[in-house]
């Protein structure tokens, strides 16, 4: 688990739950990105959050998705303010990991925040079906399950 790493790493997050996850990890520096706190999401969102993210050089980003439309090639979410934050994170990261349940390959949120070209890996709970694998291969997206 990353929490017990001996490497020195920096975690940048807008989510309170993630902040608390690394509370007692001596080798992990945690940076909290400010903004408008959304109680339902448990994190900060909006224009101020996006502006702060622009100033970071991110090696690896781990971003949740409400849906991945493999036929029309887009990542989506259900909250606009959260989506603009995710879009900026993907733009400023060298490697992008989308974290989601397998069932979200067949769901669409109202707000698009990226495409499969923006994604390097998808981390999911089980192997996707063959139709999904074929589409992901077109964009060189690797799946971890």
Tell what function each PLM region has.
Residues 10-16, 97-100, 120-126:
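Short internal beta-strands
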Residues 58-59, 119:
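Local beta-strand N-terminus motif with an aromatic residue
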Residues 109-145:
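C-terminal functional extensions of proteins
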């Amino acid at each position: 688990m990353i929490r017990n790493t001996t490497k020195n790493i920096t975690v940048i997050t807008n989510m309170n739950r993630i902040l608390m996850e690394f509370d007692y990890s001596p080798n992990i520096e945690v940076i909290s990105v400010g903004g408008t706190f959304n109680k339902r999401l448990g994190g900060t969102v909006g224009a101020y959050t996006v502006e702060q993210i622009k100033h970071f050089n991110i090696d690896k980003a781990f971003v949740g998705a409400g849906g991945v439309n493999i036929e029309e090639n887009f990542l989506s979410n259900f909250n606009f303010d959260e989506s603009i934050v995710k879009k900026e994170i993907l733009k400023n990261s060298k490697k992008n990991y989308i974290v989601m349940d397998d069932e979200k390959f067949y769901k669409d949120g109202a707000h698009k925040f990226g495409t499969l070209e923006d994604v390097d890996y998808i981390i999911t709970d089980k192997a996707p079906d063959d139709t999904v694998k074929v589409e992901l291969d077109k964009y060189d997206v690797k799946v971890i399950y």
